Amino acid sequence: MNDLFSSSFSRFRSGEPSPRRDVAGGGDGVQMANPAGSTGGVNLDKFFEDVESVKEELKELDRLNETLSSCHEQSKTLHNAKAVKDLRSKMDGDVGVALKKAKMIKVKLEALDRANAANRSLPGCGPGSSSDRTRTSVLNGLRKKLMDSMDSFNRLRELISSEYRETVQRRYFTVTGENPDERTLDRLISTGESERFLQKAIQEQGRGRVLDTINEIQERHDAVKDIEKNLRELHQVFLDMAVLVEHQGAQLDDIESHVGRASSFIRGGTDQLQTARVYQKNTRKWTCIAIIILIIIITVVVLAVLKPWNNSSGGGGGGGGGGTTGGSQPNSGTPPNPPQARRLLR
């Protein structure tokens, strides 16, 4: 799951467009702007940078585990005290590095947990939000990975202990001809008396190559004890992670509460979309009103500047003057009025 979140938010950081574009299906919809969401994106960028750092440390732990397993298989073929000692030093170093890395990863995970708690106080990032669920899921996934890695180290520790126990049992049978009981084996391994016992038995029976055999056994015993000690510390880290994972897992598996939170966020998103739609309609209405008012103002200004009614009055006066001038001239083609005709007849 954390890989899925990592890929999705890596795409978010690269600047690809978000699938949530418009409120409505149209291309002229209102784009949702959420400052809190942008802040959450920045916080998630830093969060996933820390997650990638932890993943690199976990990969190094896995590599060390594989190296230790290979060295352990190699130790089964060695029968020289010096070679066993060199291999023991190498394994001790690898176990020490693994222990340091495990503790470092644990500290980083605790820091991420505190960062998640602080992030819940930001607007839009409270408990149950998408940002909080993402952070919690990814962090819990890292804890599980660390727990799996520590579990593999624990299995290696148990394998080394059981095989060393079988080695002591075989050597005891070789010297005495009897199979030791569990109590005797525990005493020989825990107290280190197996080396002294075998040395004494071999010397008494006059077996050859006593010193090399004893030195080899001593080196194997010291290697097992040192490695087991460090691996037990790793096992303690494993137990701590198991408790945290169990606690976080109980929260993540609470399906009912998550469904309730998700439904509340859906209702809130629906309300926000409806509010944005109302704002969109109001914006369009007031835009149309403003355009109409602007057209009226422009029309009034143009009419006030041009004054077309003054030009129309001047043209009418000129026409009347022309009619007067025409009336002063005699018109031979017009017949005289009846009174004038009667005067002419007289």
Swiss-Prot record:
Residues 41-76 form a coiled coil. Expressed at low levels in roots, stems, flowers and leaves. Residues 314-326 have a biased composition (Gly residues). InterPro entries: SNARE, Syntaxin, Syntaxin/epimorphin_CS, Syntaxin_N, T_SNARE_dom. PROSITE patterns: SYNTAXIN, T_SNARE. It is a single-pass type IV membrane protein. It holds the Pfam family Syntaxin. Residues 1-12 have a biased composition (Low complexity). The keyword Transport applies. It comes from the Eukaryota. Residues 307-346 are vesicular. Part of the t-SNARE complex. Binds to SNAP33. Colocalizes with SYP61 and PIP2-7 in trafficking vesicles and at the plasma membrane. Interacts with SYP61 and PIP2-7. This is Syntaxin-121. The lineage of its organism: Eukaryota, Viridiplantae, Streptophyta, Embryophyta, Tracheophyta.
